[in-house]
Amino acid sequence: MTPQAREAILAADRVVGYLTYLDLIKDLIEGKETVGTAMMQEVDRCQQAVDLAVEGHQVVVVSSGDSGVYGMAGLVLELANKVPAEKRPSVDIVPGLSAVNVAASVLGAPLMHDFAVISLSDLMTPWDLIKKRADVCAQGDMVISLYNPRSKKRVTHLDEVREIVLKYRDPKTPVGIVQKAGRPGQHMVISDLENFTKEEVDMQTLVIIGNSQTYVENGRMITPRGYKL
C-alpha cells in the first residue's frame, strides 16, 4: 500500500469495498463505517460510494493493487459523471501498487523491456478477443503478464494461451509464477513455457511470460534492456 492510499483511508469516514479487501485492511478501518459487498456486485458497491459522497461523506473505495488497473477507478468515474453537475462529488484516483509490479520484483527484473498485461477473465471481455490480444503480443515478442490466469470455471484458458505463445517462442522461455504477491503466504516459482501450466495457479496468481531474450540466472528472471556490458 502506498503512503497516499493509507492517508486516504485514514481520512475517510466511509470505506467501501469487496469484503475480502476490507478484511485485508481491517486494522486501518477499525471504528469506521464500512460498506462491503461480495464479488460480482461492483456496480452496486460503487454506486453506494457515489451516493455517500453526494451526501457529503468522505468516502474511500478500496481496490486491490492499483485502482486504475482492473480496479474500481473507472467505474467510480463513470457513475460520478451521471450525477448532475451541481451535486457531482469530486473524485481523486489514488495510485497503488499493482500486482504485476510486486510480482516482477519478486521474480527479479522480467519487465525491463516492453510488456503487456492481459486478464484471462472472460466475464466482461469475449474469450476470442483475449486470445487475439495474446497472439498479437506474442508476435511482437512482448513480455506478457497474465492476471486471473485460472479459476474453478476457467480451467483451460491458461493452456490455450500457452499454445498461442508457443507458436512464436522457444518452449524453454522462462515463465515466472507468483501467488499472493506482497501478501502473507507469498510463493514464487520459475518454470518455462513448456511446463508452467503444471504448476499451482489460481486467481491470486500472477504469471509473467518472458520474451525471446529473457533468461534466468542465480534464481532470478532478467529481461535485458539492451545495455552493452
Q: How would you name each of these model-derived features?
A:
Residues 65-70, 97-99, 151-152:
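Gly/Ser/Thr-rich loops at beta-strand to alpha-helix junctions
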Residues 3, 71-140:
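Class I SAM-dependent methyltransferase SAM-binding "motif I" and its flanking Rossmann-like core
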Residues 1-91, 197:
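Class I S-adenosyl-L-methionine
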Residues 58, 139-229:
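A contiguous loop/helix-start segment that scaffolds small-molecule binding in enzyme catalytic cores
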Residues 28, 72-73, 103-105, 128-130, ...:
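Short, well-ordered secondary-structure micro-motifs
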